[in-house]
């Protein structure tokens, strides 16, 4: 899914149609920020991460991309920057499509402020920060990100330690499995 062409055109116009993604370090920041979206429960593959990784490798090996490749990179890199900010700010799924009783209003969206944030991120080289500013700032959301990251690390390390089979352990019982259970 791509952001509407008008939105990208507005961003390119704000940048005076200058290429923004020639610097491999800037592209690396974008790729890293997109990969980190997994900690928000978003799938980095929805934001062209594989193609951007390939461009990052190619850009690191070449001094310049061909004009057509550079134009493709501009579109492919700007699109997820705008789209991910939108998803972080408002969510990826319209909640009323999942629950007809949904009665919360969405946060207001300012396209101009979004472009300003993207322009500032590109000018300062702080790609991750533009995602940080779009995320919900609630403490519970930040804790959720931390928990998701921790659980994914636990799963990558092999998951919870197993508990040997045996009878149900009830409060006050002594059992050789209790220390293993406590360690979990």
Give, region by region, the residue ranges found by the protein language model:
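Auxiliary tRNA-acceptor-end handling modules of aminoacyl-tRNA synthetases
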Residues: 1-184
């Amino acid at each position: 899914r791509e952001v509407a062409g008008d939105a990208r055109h507005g961003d390119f116009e704000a940048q005076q149609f200058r290429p923004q993604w020639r610097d491999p370090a800037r592209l690396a920041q974008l790729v890293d920020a997109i990969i980190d979206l997994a900690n928000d429960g978003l799938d980095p593959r929805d934001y062209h991460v594989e193609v951007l990784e390939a461009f990052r490798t190619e850009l690191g090996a070449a001094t310049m991309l061909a004009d057509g490749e550079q134009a493709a990179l501009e579109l492919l890199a700007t699109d997820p920057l705008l789209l991910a900010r939108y998803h972080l700010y408002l969510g990826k799924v319209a909640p009323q499509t999942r629950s007809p009783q949904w009665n919360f209003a969405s946060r207001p969206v300012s396209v101009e402020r979004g472009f300003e944030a993207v322009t500032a991120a590109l000018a300062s080289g702080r790609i991750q920060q533009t995602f940080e500013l779009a995320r919900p700032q609630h403490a519970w959301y930040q804790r959720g990100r931390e928990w998701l990251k921790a659980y994914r690390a636990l799963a990558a390390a092999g998951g919870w330690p197993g508990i040997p089979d045996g009878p149900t352990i009830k409060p006050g019982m002594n059992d050789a499995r209790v220390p293993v259970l406590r360690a979990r």
